[in-house]
Amino acid sequence: RDRSVSRGLGDVYKRQGEQENGTNDQDGSRFSVDFDALRQINPDVVAWIRFDEPAVINYPVVQGSDNSEYLSKTFKGYDNTVGTIFVNAYNHADFNDRNTIIYGHYMYNGTMFNELEQYHEKSFWEKYPSFYIYTPDGNVATYQIYSVGVVKDTSEGYTYQFADDAAFASFLEATKASSLYDTGVEVGNDSQIVTLSTCTREGNDDRTIVHGVRVNVQPAGE
């Protein structure tokens, strides 16, 4: 089911991006999200994703009733192929699954998840090795990127349910093996992963896939 979503993200052309505002100090160190206000706009909001500035990725994250709803619906509910950043509908919304998948369009104007393409270069990862997920419980989780790959939309990296520890270990090994470079970041059976997925310029079946491991959780704004 999630693989059909990644296929659906393939046929995207240049559109204007949309972003709802969180608030932050200039360096991003005291970024905060008003989820009550966001829910008044869209009750499907479950998180906010942010990369270190000057990154463009700084968006609300929703979860629809299925994995097609937000392919062409903006956060404010308008029909537009820019869509919205969204969590796999079959994950739990609290980011406590072993692997939670977040999808976003590759917009040719540089918005949404276009910027993930820059992680194809290890030098970019060295500058910006982490991203942040803010949740309605008032916390922010830091994820350290351990793998960046260009994969097919049927890749094992899209697995989000695991029968046992061995299946999860196989997933971790597969994601490390598919990485374009060695990050040296360690993962194990107690890890919790967030996978970011977007399209590429290479072809309709290819995806840029970025895997991050949760390394810290703390109250947002501290």
Where do the model's predicted regions map?
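N-terminal low-complexity, Pro/Thr/Ser-rich intrinsically disordered segments
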Residues: 11-44
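Extracellular/periplasmic metallocenter environments
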Residues: 130, 177-222
